[in-house]
Amino acid sequence: MHVAIIGSGPAGFYTAEALLKEIPGVRVDIIDRLPTPYGLIRAGVAPDHQSIKAVDRRYAATAAADGVRFVGHVSIGSDVSMAELQQLYDAVVLATGAPHDRQLGVPGEDLPGVLGSAAFVGWYNGHPDFADLDVPLGHPGACVVGNGNVAIDVARILAKTPEELGTSDITKHSRDVLNLSRVTDIHLIGRRGPYQASFTPKEMGELGHLTRAQPLVDPAHLPPVDNDAALEPGLRKTVTHLRAFAATPPAGKPITVTFDFLTRPVRVEAVGEHLRLIVERTRLDGDVAVGTGELRGIDCGLIVSCIGYRSSPIEGAAFDDRAGRFANDDGLITAGLYAAGWARRGPSGTIGTNRPDGFGIAARIAAEVTPGGKAGGAGLDALLAARGVRATCFADWQRIDAAEIAAARPGSPREKLVRHDHLLAAGCAPGTPSL
């Protein structure tokens, strides 16, 4: 049986791993538009969270297994169509993640200086699409909209010293910009309260140990402490951190990270050379945030929206535009076509959540798909060669990996290559012309 998996992030690799266990003799091609594998492990997980990135060793073992190929630098739609893949493979799995930001939905969000978290995180993590992103850090104010871990990551990266980022794999171009940052007043804006936030304890706790930044919480935003006992353990730990922040006196640190709970963005205004985010105070009606009509403005140079992600539609695959993911019935889109991970369920859960997801899809393929003598990878190779597409393989990635590690500054695991041509040049085997 020949299976194509579109997307080389956690969902793609867990699905490939499961297919090897479920279907003897299966041949799996993991296809990605980037020259490099690992998806959000490489380009989404915060650069100062290296222990989380270590899961790529498991994926590398899958990529090196007999019957699995990584096929990078191939775009679905322009290099090969979905219809062609379905002709070549017995089953196709969409594991493309959710690479696009959800819109704030407020006037002025298209102004320069308003960024989505996918762009901002991609910028400091070395995603080639965002190597030239303009990140304005010349104003003291920065607003981060959202009450989840991505918002915490963004605030933490803005607040850390160069020394604190020294052991990370943050990119050189973003280090250079961050080192000149004038940001001193970071606002974390959430429309609901602490009990409704999606922060996890580890990420929250890190904010309390930054060299030059102090987290600030208005005690009035915290529910009565006796109510904490009814919370699930993780949320209770998070709220305990927030209570500690609220009780800590000012320490004279040059940067503050203010948690603006019960606050929602209304519009963005251009004021001279900077921005003003107009926000409305909210109140809770149950767990629903309701506007009070009380407005105020926060002056800033940068606004980063961290309110969720959407998958990218692919011609030939039914898409649920409202949910921002592929339309599917427990992973099945149509006969022989499946979705896994965020492409199936939307952006939820942890990296590990994708493992049972991938194993479930593999079990469905084993039960539902009959091998049809299709060409599989050999057919894809012939098609790409005829079109002049130079795909990367896992050996190419290993050369890129080695080049990045060799270029690392002291204390850092690697210096990422961030442009397609540099990645392709580094990945070429000796004697192979680069693009």
Kindly label every feature range from the protein language model.
Residues 156-290, 369-373:
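Dinucleotide-binding/catalytic capping subdomain of oxidoreductase cores
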Residues 34-91, 237-254, 258:
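N-terminal Rossmann-like dinucleotide/flavin-binding domain of flavoprotein oxidoreductases
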